[in-house]
Amino acid sequence: MRALITTANLIVGKSGATTVAGSSIGLSNDEDRKRFKQLREESDLIIIGGNTARREPYKRTPIPLYILTHTKVRLQPKNQLAKQFLLPPAQLFKEISENFPPIESSSAVKVLVEAGPMLLQSLIDQGLIDHLYLTTNLIKDGENRISVDHLVANFELVSQEIIEETKFEQYKKI
């Protein structure tokens, strides 16, 4: 059984919007994409939910992609590294801990959660997220607003940086 280090990444608009026209892409910019890529490079595995699988471009990922869903409908994008799981989140995390290759490794599995706000909040409420990277676009806004205060309530702020119209915050679980 391997330890998991779980990191989540989310971008929001100036008033907590999580999408523009149904996707987070409209809130992103070059600096956000650069940091997003860096998080992926430091991870072993990406977890997304079914809504994210349907709305965001996940046809290719540099590392395995696990889709956590509550439906039997096949959601996997045409991605050779994608697997779909119909499990409660805690059970999926246990499955990863016990069976993520190489099984004989003693190093922690670095999991990057790129889920939407509903699944992310559920994972946070279950205590399954260790680190949260929150990007706020200080200019743009959209729909599907969330309470950022509620999202970060179980975390402490580790660092904050503002570059042009974007605020980057890093949190760790309390």
Q: PLM features: residue spans?
A:
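Enzymes that bind and transform nitrogen-containing heteroaromatic metabolites
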Residues: 1-174
